[in-house]
Amino acid sequence: MSYKLKFLPSALKEWNKIGSTIRDQLKKKLKERLNDPDVPADRLTGFKNHYKIKLRSAGYRLVYEVDQGNVSVIVITVGKRERSEVYIKAKKISQ
């Protein structure tokens, strides 16, 4: 079953700011995740139903939430991993 992709407004702004190369890499990974979003290895501790997509070489992270009720994947935030900023931002948004 394929999930629908949704963005929080703040995440969409961040998405539009990143370069096209990084965006293309994230699109490819997101496409895979829409078929199977529950990846235990990428589950974020301290969050409920939140997962990450990592681009190690670029240092970017995308944090998303799986909404089983609406069969959707909601992008919470996108950004550099520097000083765990992307995870701190995700925690603030999710509260």
Which residues are covered by each model-predicted region?
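Solvent-exposed, charged interface segments at domain starts and junctions
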Residues: 1-2, 41
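Enriched for short, Lys/Arg-rich terminal
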Residues: 2-6, 12-13, 17, 24, ...
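Compact soluble domain cores
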Residues: 21-33
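A short, surface-exposed loop/turn module that caps and links secondary-structure elements
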Residues: 31-55
